[in-house]
């Protein structure tokens, strides 16, 4: 599983601010916060790409990568934790801002596929 990442894409009318807000939210979610602090995972933003690696306009996505130090991280558990974190962020955004928050798609991706 060390060659798989977790990709998060916000769909619909998501803004760069939404992507950054979600990343900040995830960085404070337990146990992701602990895994980040211990260097077992990394979270980064990057331009969204299609399956063939070509850029998809100006949209951004978030990628969570398990590092070699985090090789013992159980990938499916991490994937479910990220999904719960995205749901919690959407619930919070709905409570503090007008309008429906963008949908989030969380999926595993092979590292070499982008």
Short names for language-model regions:
Residues 65-76:
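Short, glycine/alanine-rich hydrophobic alpha-helices that insert into or span membranes
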């Amino acid at each position: 599983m060390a060659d798989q990442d977790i990709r998060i894409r916000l769909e619909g009318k998501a803004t760069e601010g939404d992507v950054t807000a979600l990343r900040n939210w995830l960085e404070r979610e337990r146990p992701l916060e602990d895994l980040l602090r211990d260097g077992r995972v990394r979270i980064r933003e990057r331009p969204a790409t299609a399956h063939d690696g070509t850029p998809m306009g100006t949209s951004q996505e978030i990628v969570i990568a398990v590092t070699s130090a985090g090789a013992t991280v159980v990938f499916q558990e991490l994937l479910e934790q990220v999904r719960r974190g995205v749901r919690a962020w959407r619930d919070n955004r709905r409570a503090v801002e007008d309008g429906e928050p963008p949908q989030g798609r969380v999926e595993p991706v092979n590292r070499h596929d982008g």
